[in-house]
From Swiss-Prot:
Membrane topology: Single-pass membrane protein
GO cellular component, one term: mitochondrion
Catalytic activity reported: 2 Fe(III)-[cytochrome b5] + NADH = 2 Fe(II)-[cytochrome b5] + NAD(+) + H(+)
Root EC class: oxidoreductase
GN (gene name): CYB5R1
One Pfam family it belongs to: NAD_binding_1
Family, as annotated: Belongs to the flavoprotein pyridine nucleotide cytochrome reductase family.
Major location (coarse): membrane
Protein name: NADH-cytochrome b5 reductase 1
GO terms (BP aspect): sterol biosynthetic process
Length: 305
């Protein structure tokens, strides 16, 4: 007959196992309790957020800061996603997408950087921007409806992207070691969101390349943020500008996004390459995509916000 374990030994083992389980459960609950509460709990719900502050960024752009429910709340926006703001303006419901320039490391508030398109300034848009003018008219303490997270792209970290071909399709996994980005105007905000997320992780191998197009030098928003990131991570982030109307002595490119600009400043087509585009539709459709076609970037290598 084999030796039978004593009841005392079995009891000791049982107590030890229960102790380990208790410690593990306690650690999990502590970690969970330390997680800040999330604002955007349901992507189909609207959340009213109060305007905290409004500051001027440049001649036509402002930063709007909205309060979250408490000083400990985070927005709850995965990297790659955006929010929708909605308001009833002149009797009509107006909805616009925006990507915050803050992240879930910021508690108690969310910041949006938005160009304010004023009435009677641009001949193609005589009425200006409905939502941007509405936001600019708000007083401190006024509320705006937020909804999200929204969007077809999510960044999971370390070069892993989950991209939905459309809203009803399941996400498809993509791995990109070289991330090229073409942004125009306020299309820079989703790019900055991604760049920050990648560069803050020292173990993320993704290389970032940004081509940022604007009309004039004074139109370049978030330039200081971008140049600071480039200076701190010169081996991981390459930054290039192009202007329609550059000043004398301009050190970067001139004109619309072109084949030569893309060839020189963005990663070449490849299995480990993903190109993201965000900007005015004419720039994206008439300048970017035709140039990418000529250079051999397949549809799988591109994503347009």
């Amino acid at each position: 007959m084999g030796l039978q374990p004593s009841p005392v030994l079995l009891a000791s083992l049982g107590v030890g196992l229960l102790t380990l389980l208790g410690v593990a459960l306690g650690a999990y609950l502590v970690r969970r309790s330390r997680r800040p509460p999330v604002t955007l709990l349901d992507p189909n719900e609207k959340y009213q957020l109060r305007l905290l502050d409004k500051t001027t960024v440049n001649h036509n752009t402002k930063r709007f800061r909205f309060a979250l429910p408490t000083a400990h709340h985070v927005l709850g926006l995965p990297v790659g996603k955006h929010v929708y703001l909605s308001a009833r303006i002149d009797g009509s419901l107006v909805i616009r997408p925006y990507t915050p320039v803050t992240s879930d490391e910021d508690q108690g508030y969310v910041d949006l950087v938005i160009k304010v398109y004023l009435k009677g300034v641009h001949p193609k848009f005589p009425e200006g921007g409905k939502m941007s003018q509405y936001l600019d008219s708000l007083k401190i303490g006024d509320v705006v409806e937020f909804r999200g997270p929204s969007g077809l792209l999510t960044y999971a970290g370390k070069g892993k992207f989950n991209i939905q071909p459309n809203k009803k399709a399941p996400p498809e996994a993509r791995v990109a070691r070289n991330l090229g980005m073409i942004a125009g105007g306020t299309g820079i905000t989703p790019m900055l969101q991604l760049i920050r997320a990648i560069l803050k992780d020292p173990e993320d191998p993704t290389q970032c390349f940004l081509l940022f197009a604007n009309q004039t030098e004074k139109d370049i928003i978030l330039r200081e943020d971008l140049e600071e990131l480039q200076a701190r991570h010169p081996g991981r982030f390459k930054l290039w500008f192009t202007l329609d109307h550059p000043p004398e002595g301009w050190a970067y490119s001139k004109g619309f996004v072109s084949v030569d600009m893309i060839r020189e400043h963005l990663p070449a087509p490849g299995e480990d390459v993903l190109l993201l585009l965000c900007g005015p539709p004419p720039m994206v459709q008439l300048a970017c995509h035709p140039s990418l076609d000529k250079l051999g970037y397949s549809p799988k290598m591109r994503f347009t916000y």
